[in-house]
């Protein structure tokens, strides 16, 4: 399944040369140095997680069933204040083990100690867009901006081009006008995209109304942001029709995080209205500290079901559209759609083999329905990024999973002790 617009699934071969797809088509039957026989399997583009906080895998299940602000202020921020660069490194590796196992090949990450995440990405062999999250409520904003700049200088284009960097003002409610303008200015100067949370809860909308007399979207729009740079907006749950109009024509788009939104009771993002206005939508998990899973197959289902339920219309967000969101949609949000997101000659070989030899994946009336509504991450047999096999026959080849699990248990226990 190439995910190229209008191209039907076919039985065939994919020939890789180096990091790229050289040829793809029905039964090419070419000689090769190495052959993966994939009878009964389906090849598709790697999944793109368009928004998350990878080291929060260490906080999975530590604090559930709370409102967003209580969860963040009372639980996550105190645990994060204890995180060392080494904790972040091992938390990111834990997340990457889960992502590779469930077919994610690229992800957009916003967090702290980003140098350690970059090292982990380099070693794991994944593709990532990395962002130093910028919260400006305390007075060390200058140090954070310097860290964002250092990250860009050291890692943009790094790991053989698999790493790119964005500038990350965290959210309208944590970024007053002056530092927000500085962050946007930095992005413009470095020609980098912006990655920012937007309008996740009704409370956020009320806070912005009280502080600035504007919706969160109006607040960002007023800076000229959407005309100036490529923007990755995470969540965008509470947007009015007018807000959606303000985003029309933007470069970048929206990372929809349906499982996180469901679990935190945030609301249903107006995804169908956004796509109706021509906005690009991708899918993200958010951190495992809120969503508890990094399996994008869960997000595909949740995204489709939420739109169908919210609009009381089973035709809303059909299977193929959800699959396009999690592949080429995410690639567009990360600014790498020229490299990945579809299977076609010349693009990077970022792809998965999904094992269809399972009772819950038979019979094959519709591959797109099976993938969107019946498959899960454990059905992924093989994950390949830039032509390198990261998982084969469900065995991780670039990560030491036993060591990662050991490090994660010890470090997670220390982070949450007494909180
Ligand atoms: C400063 S790094 C990023 C920062 O974001 C926090 N975070 C995680 N999930 C969410 C969410 O759903 N909304 C807002 N902020 C979130 C994370 O804990 C880090 O502190
Ligand atoms: Zn987030």
Give the residues covered by each predicted segment.
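Active-site gating loops and adjacent loop-to-helix segments of metal-dependent hydrolytic enzymes
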Residues: 58-90, 97, 124-138, 201-230, ...
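His/Asp/Glu-enriched, well-ordered alpha-helical/loop segment
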Residues: 222-228, 272-358, 374-376
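N-terminal metal-binding scaffold of metallo-dependent hydrolase/deaminase domains
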Residues: 1-31, 42
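Metal-coordinating catalytic core of metallo-dependent amide/deamination hydrolases
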Residues: 116-238, 242
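Alpha-helical scaffold segments that flank or form the walls of functional sites
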Residues: 60-126, 147-158, 409-413, 417
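C-terminal cap of metal-dependent C-N hydrolases
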Residues: 2, 348-405
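Divalent metal-coordination and catalytic microenvironments
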Residues: 14, 19, 40, 51, ...
């Amino acid at each position: 399944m190439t995910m190229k617009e209008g191209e039907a699934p076919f039985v065939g071969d994919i020939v890789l040369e180096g990091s790229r797809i050289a040829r793809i088509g029905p039964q090419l039957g070419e000689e090769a140095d190495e052959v993966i026989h994939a009878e009964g399997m389906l090849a598709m583009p790697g999944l793109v997680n368009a928004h998350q906080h990878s080291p929060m895998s260490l906080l999975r299940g530590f604090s559930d069933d709370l409102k967003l602000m209580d969860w963040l202020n009372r639980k996550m921020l105190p645990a994060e204040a204890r995180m060392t660069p080494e904790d972040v490194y091992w938390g990111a590796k834990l997340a990457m083990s889960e992502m590779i196992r469930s077919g994610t090949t690229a992800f957009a990450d916003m967090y702290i100690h980003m140098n350690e995440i970059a090292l982990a990405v380099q070693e794991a062999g994944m593709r990532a867009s990395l962002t130093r999250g910028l919260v400006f409520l305390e007075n060390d904003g200058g140090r954070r901006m310097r860290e964002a700049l250092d990250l860009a200088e050291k890692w943009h284009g790094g790991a053989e081009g698999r790493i790119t960097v964005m500038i990350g003002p965290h959210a309208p409610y944590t970024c007053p006008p002056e530092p927000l303008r500085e962050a946007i200015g930095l992005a413009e100067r470095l020609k980098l995209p912006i990655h920012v949370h937007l309008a996740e809860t009704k409370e956020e909308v009320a806070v912005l109304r009280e502080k600035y007399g504007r919706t969160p979207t109006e607040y960002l729009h007023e800076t000229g942001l959407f005309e100036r740079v490529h923007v990755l907006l995470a969540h965008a749950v509470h947007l009015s029709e007018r807000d959606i109009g303000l985003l029309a024509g933007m470069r970048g788009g929206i990372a929809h995080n349906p499982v996180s939104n469901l679990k935190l009771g945030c609301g249903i993002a107006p995804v169908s209205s956004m796509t109706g206005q021509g906005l690009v939508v991708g899918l993200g998990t958010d951190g495992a500290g809120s969503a508890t899973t990094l399996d994008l197959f869960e997000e595909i289902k949740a995204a489709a079901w939420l739109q169908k339920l919210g609009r009381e219309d089973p035709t809303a967000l059909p299977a193929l559209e959800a699959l396009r969101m999690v592949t080429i949609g995410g690639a567009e949000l990360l600014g790498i759609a020229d490299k990945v997101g579809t299977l076609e000659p010349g693009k990077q070989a970022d792809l998965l083999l999904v094992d269809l030899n399972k009772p819950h994946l038979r019979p094959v009336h519709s591959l797109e329905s099976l993938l969107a509504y019946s498959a899960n991450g454990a059905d992924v047999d093989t994950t390949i990024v830039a032509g390198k096999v990261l998982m084969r026959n469900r065995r991780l080849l670039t990560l030491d999973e036993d060591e990662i699990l050991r490090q994660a248990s010890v470090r997670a226990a220390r982070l949450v002790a007494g909180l």
